[in-house]
Swiss-Prot record:
<dbReference type="InterPro" id="IPR003774">
    <property type="entry name" value="AlgH-like"/>
</dbReference>
<dbReference type="GO" id="GO:0005829">
    <property type="term" value="C:cytosol"/>
</dbReference>
<dbReference type="Pfam" id="PF02622">
    <property type="entry name" value="DUF179"/>
</dbReference>
<comment type="similarity">
    <text>Belongs to the UPF0301 (AlgH) family.</text>
</comment>
<protein>
    <recommendedName>
        <fullName>UPF0301 protein ABAYE3454</fullName>
    </recommendedName>
</protein>
Length: 184
């Protein structure tokens, strides 16, 4: 049987997620292969505006569209990741899905600051990562649900709506889920 990888899909935290950091999150998987997985939380604002972040990096951002930076995950919170539509045209761009790329180089930040060449995007600080077979084990335990990624979920919906929207994509009303089965 061939192993199914989940790059360009989303993980959905169950309502009773044991790990507080990942409670109520939706994680876009930018990489999943035999060595492990990496993803970006797409529904948790970091409390900083893109203009502020760009100014901190000495990038003139007077014309940037208002947008919140995301808290992408617990690892390397000082590192920036740009999840965006389009082709992998920047220095460190990698295509991860149809019309979805992730870029870590400064040249894309300059383009964002000047509203040039970047369609829809999310900037995240930090990322989540799983070692070999770790994510598969967590999914088997019921630690995560999985849904297909789409442009609305990744880029358009308000952050507060993305968790519920991910549940709707798999046809589940999360209020019906329970962490434990009762006994009569």
């Amino acid at each position: 049987m061939t192993k199914q990888y989940m790059t360009h899909r989303c993980l959905i935290a169950p309502p009773e997620m044991a790990d507080d950091f990942f409670a109520n999150t939706v994680i876009y998987l930018a990489r999943h292969d035999e060595e492990g997985a990496q993803g970006i939380i797409i529904n948790r604002p970091a409390g900083i505006q893109i203009k502020e972040l760009l100014n901190d990096l000495d990038i003139d951002a007077d014309n940037v569209n208002p947008h919140e930076v995301l808290q992408g995950g617990p690892l390397r919170p000082e590192a920036g990741f740009v999840l965006h539509t389009g082709q992998p045209t920047w220095h460190s761009s990698i295509a991860v899905g149809e019309n979805v790329c992730i870029t870590t180089s400064k040249d894309i930040l300059d383009a964002i600051a000047h509203n040039e060449g970047v369609g829809r995007y999310q900037i995240a600080l930090g990322y989540a990562s799983w070692g070999k077979n770790q994510l598969e084990d967590e999914i088997a335990r019921g630690d995560w649900l999985i849904c297909d990624a789409d442009m609305d979920l990744i880029f358009n919906l308000p952050y507060d709506d993305r968790w519920d929207a991910a549940y709707k994509k798999i046809g589940v009303d999360r209020t019906w889920l329970a962490s434990e089965i009762g006994h009569a």
